[in-house]
Amino acid sequence: MSNRDTLFSTPVANLGDWTFDERVAEVFPDMIQRSVPGYANIISMIGMLAERFVQEDSQVYDLGCSLGAATLSVRRNIKASGCRIIAVDNSPAMVERCRRHIDAFRADTPVEVIEADIRRVPIENASLVVLNFTLQFLRPEERQQLLNTIWQGLKPGGALVLSEKFSFNDADVGELLFNMHHDFKRANGYSELEISQKRSMLENVMLTDSVETHKQRLKLAGFQHAELWFQCFNFGSLVALKAGHA
């Protein structure tokens, strides 16, 4: 059972930029369920995608794994044998807790949890790569290179799951979905103070792209097929496929 997120329920004098530190890791499951609409659905459906795409004797990468929710969903649903999951995060607090979460569940598929910069991790023999609300924390000029690396490391017939918060070219649509997201957070018990303080901390470190921009990058990386498979307000997930057969 995770602790309830009350990190920003009182005024913070010097907010600074957002970091995934010990305090955030401690309340992260509650925070993300109450902040990201559709998160639980995305996690469970990543497991369904894993059942379809993970190939025999291949590797799965969960880049920006946080506490390992996507990794556990993948591991529960893998039917192929001889696979290995590599879960990567650059937050020591997240990695420590992720290892504990993974170790709490028995399964045949081994998981290696690595504390590292996802931009420096080689992608090899991969049949599935998960980027779950991670790319948006890289500088925009670094995003294409990571997608290129992922495509190069994927086996033919492999897939990338890319979940992100989106911006919108249509300002009216963007404003509506932005407001709906805030309604969602209010309905989940967050106060105006909590919402505004968190937004202030995130605005310099989480820079969102439109779905169109994501699709353009994926095409440039080499993915011949990429489409939005899930969306709730201004959050969603794309699946990108590498051509060929396993």
Swiss-Prot record:
The keyword DNA repair does not apply. The keyword S-adenosyl-L-methionine applies. GO terms for molecular function: carboxyl- or carbamoyltransferase activity; S-adenosyl-L-methionine binding. InterPro entries: CmoA (IPR005271), Methyltransf_25 (IPR041698), SAM-dependent_MTases_sf (IPR029063). It is an enzyme of class 2 (transferase). S-adenosyl-L-methionine binds at Y39, G64, C65, S66, D89, N90, D117, I118, N132, R199. It catalyses: prephenate + S-adenosyl-L-methionine = carboxy-S-adenosyl-L-methionine + 3-phenylpyruvate + H2O. It comes from the Bacteria. GO terms for biological process: tRNA wobble uridine modification. Its EC number is 2.1.3.-. Keywords: S-adenosyl-L-methionine, Transferase. SUPFAM superfamilies: S-adenosyl-L-methionine-dependent methyltransferases (SSF53335). Pfam families: Methyltransf_25 (PF13649). HAMAP family: Cx_SAM_synthase. Catalyzes the conversion of S-adenosyl-L-methionine (SAM) to carboxy-S-adenosyl-L-methionine (Cx-SAM). Belongs to the class I-like SAM-binding methyltransferase superfamily. Cx-SAM synthase family. Homodimer. This is Carboxy-S-adenosyl-L-methionine synthase. It comes from Erwinia tasmaniensis (strain DSM 17950 / CFBP 7177 / CIP 109463 / NCPPB 4357 / Et1/99). The gene is cmoA.
